[in-house]
A protein has these predicted regions:
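Hydrophobic transmembrane alpha-helices
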Residues: 5-84
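Helix-coil boundary and interhelical linker segments in multi-pass alpha-helical membrane proteins
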Residues: 5-13, 47-58, 94-117, 178
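Hydrophobic residues within the alpha-helical transmembrane core of Major Facilitator Superfamily
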Residues: 17, 53, 88, 123-126
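Membrane-water interface at transmembrane helix exits
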Residues: 22, 26-27, 51-52, 93, ...
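Small-residue-rich segments of transmembrane alpha-helices in multi-pass membrane proteins
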Residues: 41-51, 87-97, 163-166
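Membrane-interface helix-loop-helix junctions at boundaries between adjacent transmembrane segments
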Residues: 63-122, 141-153
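Helix-loop-helix junctions within the multi-pass membrane cores of secondary transporters/permeases
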Residues: 107-178
Length: 178
């Protein structure tokens, strides 16, 4: 009998950090963070490395990438958050495949993976807008600093405070869900 995959706290924390890095433009930039690390194909590889099953991670990532390959975010609107798909959906799908004894390369395995991806993508959208809403507080603080000509405060407001938003709406949910 095969061992069922379990996700440890350390693995969940690493997945949460990857989720944060892939959603913060200030970290890797949009090109590396959101448009590379946050995509399911790359996220599948990263999840596979963290969870110790690279083959399943890549296959699950491929199945989810097919669903979201043409996803665009015009004007900042988000219909599905691929960061959540990559770092919540893929690990959960990998654990589910393991517990059901399904191969990720099978049709049933791919169907299970994509169902997890679409479910979590919708949840991720809510979390994305939660982050954006909290960031409005920092924006208001930034405008006040500009009005008072306290330009040095802008570094903290622009680069430091958004981490709080991402910890609340990205890191913590990713760790808890995994």
């Amino acid at each position: 009998r095969e061992c069922v995959m379990q996700i440890s706290w350390l693995q969940a924390i690493l997945l949460g950090l990857c989720a944060c890095l892939s959603s913060m433009p200030g970290m890797g930039g949009s090109s590396i963070g959101n448009y590379t690390l946050g995509r399911p194909l790359v996220g599948g590889l990263v999840c596979g490395l963290i969870l110790g099953d690279i083959r399943t991670g890549i296959l699950v990532g491929c199945a989810m990438q097919v669903v979201y390959i043409a996803l665009v975010t015009p004007g900042g609107t988000v219909s599905a958050d691929v960061r959540a798909v990559s770092y919540i959906g893929i690990p959960l799908a990998m654990a589910a495949l393991s517990s059901y004894g399904l191969d990720a390369a099978s049709a049933d395995g791919a169907a299970l993976a994509t169902s997890f991806g679409t479910m979590v993508g919708t949840l991720g959208t809510v979390l994305f807008y939660g982050t954006a809403t909290i960031n409005l507080v920092w924006q208001h603080m930034g405008w006040k600093a500009v009005e008072k000509r306290q330009y040095r405060k802008l570094y903290l407001i622009d680069m430091g405070f958004p981490w709080i938003s991402h910890l609340i709406c990205c890191f913590i949910p990713s760790v808890i869900k995994c």
